[in-house]
Structures are given as C-alpha cells and as structure tokens.
Amino acid sequence: MADKAILWALISASTKEGRKACSLSYFACKAAEAELGLAYMAANDNKEFLTSLSNIMRYKIDAGLSESYTCYLLSKGKIIRPYLKNLNPLQLAADCIETVNKIKDKNKKNH
C-alpha cells in the first residue's frame, strides 16, 4: 500500500489523467502520503519492505521525494545491496508501464 501512495502522488502530479483520477482514489494527489509511504517502507528491514523500497526505482521521482528516497537507500547500507543488484532495469520499466496502463484502463472503464 505504501508503494501505491507513491505511485498515485507521481501520477496525479504529472498527467492530465492523473489529476482527473484525484477524485477517484484515496491515494491520488497526496504528496504527504508518498513521503509517509516511503518512510514506512524504509523503517522496516524485512525482505518484503526492502524489495518494495528498491523497486521504487521503477518510477521517475524528483524533488523532495527523490532526496528522501536517496537518503533512505543510503541509510540501509549493505542490507539493501542485494536487492539493488537484483534489479533488472528493463523489467522495472516494463512493470512501471504495465502498472500505469492498468490504471489508465481502469479509469476508462469508470468513465
């Protein structure tokens, strides 16, 4: 759920469709929730959260969220390395596109 908060904050800020979705999703247009979601993932050291934290790289993030993300990754030290090494850039891009397309399809069905 924390990664969904980040996704919706990014989508709502960068696209016409995303801004339109603000009225349809609790997570949309919530930059504070994106920061909170990121902090929540970073506060945990179990496999699920470390995987989610490393996979956030699939999104293009900027400004304060990007700075926070970099700080959280660096604060993990060696524990995050295997998760980052296992990332496949092509798969991350494909996952991001698939996620966004699913959201677009769902929004088309709702209108």
Curated annotation (Swiss-Prot):
Pfam families: Imm57
InterPro entries membership: Imm57
Additional information: May be missing up to 40 C-terminal residues compared to orthologs.
Protein's recorded name: Protein YibV
UniProt source species: Escherichia coli (strain K12)
